[in-house]
Amino acid sequence: MNHIDVTQRINELRTLIRRYDYHYYVLDDPIVSDAEYDALMNELRALEAAHPELITPDSPTQRVSGTPASQFAKVQHPQPMLSLGNAFTTTDLLAWRDRVLRLLGQDTAVAYVVEPKIDGLAVALTYHDGQFVQGATRGDGEVGEDVTANLRTISSIPLLLHPPDGGHDRDVPTALPSLIEVRGEVYMRTADFEALNDRLAAAGEKIFANPRNAAAGSLRQKDPAITAARPLRFFAYGVGPVEGVELTGQWQTLRYLRMLGFPVNQDVRRFTDFDEVLAYCEQWMARRDELTYEADGMVIKIDDFAQQRELGVVGRDPRWAIAFKFPPREAITRLLNITVNVGRTGVVTPNAELEPVQIGGVIVRNASLHNADYIAQRDIRIGDYVIVKRAGDVIPYVVGPVVARRDGSERPWQFPTHCPACGSPLEREPGEAAWRCNNFGICPAQLVRRLEHFASRAALDIVGLGERQAELFVQRGLVRDVADLFYLKAEDFAGLEGFGPKRIANLLNAIDAARQRPLDRLIVGLGIRYVGSVAAQALVNSLGSLDAIMNARQEELEQIPGIGPVVAASIVDFFAHPENRQLIEKLRAAGVQMNAGPQRERKSDVLAGQTFVLTGTLPSLTREQASALIIAHGGKVTDSVSKKTNYVVAGVNAGSKLAKAQQLGIPVLDEAALLALIGER
């Protein structure tokens, strides 16, 4: 073929492949076999290889390109990618509907667009004159990460927009936008996730816990070739900035996106009657297992963009949209055995060993049984079929037995009378549910957990010291308390499995750096009962040194904001034990920081008089950083939610504090909303 013929054939092949991609990914209606498709793609690759001057960035062959990135660049979103407020019951949804109508006017006609809430990773795709130029993760809603090269590898994301023809939708624009930011979710279908995990397991690699983690981990690979090998998909659900066309509503926007070549959820619906909205949500709550992907709820949006603008945004949550969350998933499986774990404070916790069962995309083999009373009250027996729930779709726990399925082979379980690690008698304080091993100084299980806690990110942050290393150190007798870490030498690691010269040097450097951590982090690391990051910061801010804290009287401690009688008594009791004071002196002799550093600069009084409670894991700030930020702007941070709490800042895996805040009607912020509140974005 001459050059003109080659150019013409390449263009024909690209047009055909894009058409077949559109039918496969958008219309879900393949019109050629895989073999025919592969033959066309191979022909295109061969022609482009022979004529590299004809390769263009939007060619279907150019999805995987570039070299592995060392890190992802930050991307400022031109418009914030907002989070959604949550509704957990139909009562919550009706309350949201009533607020909308109160703001718009009771007689205002309102339409709602409803679709399943895919549990994936939110991204924004930018197109200039129809060509894909940049893709970014949501990040904190204001700033995300540039993952353009990886997003290009996802076949369901068009590199070149499909010219819209309008079809039967006369209200849908027929022009290509000069600029459009398309927002949606990168996800992995359940079947693809399971197949990926099977391949990883067969190769001896670490498997993913659930499809969302798999999607997020695959998209954030530094090498686009790895992302390309993962079965990622994309659903579009909205837009950011748009230029060159006018979009007036959510329903119209979704149809327009579909015409441009984006997959849009087939289960999206538009309703004008809110009773139909409720029925549709309840229908999918009952049928969620029929979905080919993991969904944790339904998203309801006001259709009309003018009404959306009128309703506006509160914090980081739009008033014009809400997420109806499905209840925690549960399953029935057999309880094989009950074991106990000894924590760093000596609390002995029962753990259920289960026949593996899938709950919400995760294989569950172990679950919490809380305490001895919980087991006794529910008459949970070894061999029982039990109901297992994942609280917040994260933490599995046993709800109770299915008594009707008992066959007489089940065995009652007795809580141990002695510590399984050191043999000391277990004790229980009056009014408490927990049994404890009080052999604080000798119990090896407690020491392992204390070492883990001492080295954790919230405490001294000793990178390279985790559960496995702590167990090795205790088994070999290298440490008898946390202070011994600072006396370790390179020769102590001789013959220790997994410790080569480089790893030893890195760990010793991390331990050395831990000597200069802020005093509040050391206090957290000591593991004083009831004293977390917030209380530790309050102690340091008020008293300034570990000596002052050690020697403070209970009534003096109770005067510190955020330190109540129970916490104060626990602090006094901890330092009343001679072995704990000896530990402090040993740490002091090792050069560990015992005094507060320079006072944190007060940045503003914007949060003066406001009380905050933190719960869950925030996207970029640690709990300590968030607390310090609030305090620096005049706010106060406490550990418990009450009517006096002004805001609860909630992250991933938020627990009972979030539930109590919602019960009391206390405003809930995410990290981005907190930063917006204090003017730090």
Curated annotation (Swiss-Prot):
PROSITE patterns with a match to the protein in the record: BRCT (PS50172), DNA_LIGASE_N1 (PS01055)
Active site, renumbered: 117 (n6-amp-lysine intermediate)
The cofactors required by this protein are: Mg(2+); Mn(2+)
By its UniProt entry, which Pfam families does this protein fall under? BRCT, DNA_ligase_aden, DNA_ligase_OB, DNA_ligase_ZBD, HHH_2, Nlig-Ia
CDD domains, from UniProt? Answer: LIGANc
Which EC number(s) does UniProt give? 6.5.1.2
Keyword check for Signal, yes or no: no
Q: Which InterPro entries match?
A: BRCT_dom, BRCT_dom_sf, DisA/LigA_HHH, DNA_ligase, DNA_ligase_AS, DNAligase_adenylation, DNAligase_N, Hlx-hairpin-Hlx_DNA-bd_motif
- The residues that hold NAD(+) are 34-38, 83-84, 115, 138, 185, 301, 325
What are the GO BP annotations of this UniProt entry? DNA repair; DNA replication
Binding residues annotated for Zn(2+), in chain numbering:
419, 422, 437, 443
Reactions catalysed, semicolon-separated, are: NAD(+) + (deoxyribonucleotide)n-3'-hydroxyl + 5'-phospho-(deoxyribonucleotide)m = (deoxyribonucleotide)n+m + AMP + beta-nicotinamide D-nucleotide
Instruction: Name all BRCT domain ranges.
Output: 602-681
What keywords does the record list, in alphabetical order?
Answer: DNA damage, DNA repair, DNA replication, Ligase, Magnesium, Manganese, Metal-binding, NAD, Zinc
- Extract one GO molecular function annotation from the record: DNA binding
Q: Which GO terms describe its cellular component?
A: cytosol
Task: State the protein's purpose.
Answer: DNA ligase that catalyzes the formation of phosphodiester linkages between 5'-phosphoryl and 3'-hydroxyl groups in double-stranded DNA using NAD as a coenzyme and as the energy source for the reaction. It is essential for DNA replication and repair of damaged DNA.
Family of the protein in this entry: Belongs to the NAD-dependent DNA ligase family. LigA subfamily.
Its protein name is DNA ligase
Gene name in the database record: ligA
